[in-house]
Amino acid sequence: YIRKKHNVLIGERTAEQLKISIGCVYERTEEDKKIRPESVEIRGRSLVSGLPKTLTITADEMFEAFEEPAYSIVDAVKAVLEKTPPELVGDISEKGIVMTGGGSLVWGLDRLIACETGIHCEVADDTISCVAIGTGKSLDMLDILMDGSARNKYYKQ
């Protein structure tokens, strides 16, 4: 996005800094704007001159940059819900969706998913560690998981 819109090349660390500090995928309220910064100054290399260049990137620009990938995530959630057995969808609808992993920390993703699916969505406590802990538990029970998936008609589709 930064390269296309501003003709400036930035590194992964700078992109991560932008994502964490002002990245958002849902329209921010006035209250939200008081909590999070409106803009961040970054440095990169101009693709025109090859020289260092400083830019001020706004939260609105990040909203624009994240729009397409955010809706891809929403579409994936909807696709999973469409393939989920009805009784399980009922439970999910009642109890909500709990997001884990670093991507769940992108500001407003929980609100966007809730708005688009009509299902309450929240970010897990200690969301980064949840992924590692869950992966470890899954590996401990791999034989059970493989046996269950081999017999599950929904898994084979």
Can you describe what each PLM-predicted range is?
Residues 1-67:
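Phosphate-binding glycine-rich/basic clefts of nucleotide- and phosphate-handling proteins
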Residues 6-12, 28, 81-89, 145-149:
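Active-site phosphate-binding and catalytic loops of NTP-dependent enzymes
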Residues 8-16, 137-157:
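Acidic, glycine/GT-rich loop-and beta-edge segments that sit at the periphery of enzyme/chaperone cores
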Residues 18, 77, 99, 135:
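Residue-level signature of catalytic and energy-coupling elements of molecular machines
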Residues 23, 89-113:
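Glycine-rich phosphate-binding loops at beta-strand->alpha-helix junctions
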Residues 37, 94-95, 118:
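Active-site lining segments that contact anionic ligands and/or coordinate catalytic metals
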Residues 65-92, 138-141:
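Phosphate/ATP-binding catalytic cores across multiple sugar-kinase/actin-like superfamilies
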Residues 111-137, 145, 152:
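Conserved phosphate-binding/catalytic loops in two-lobed NTP-binding clefts
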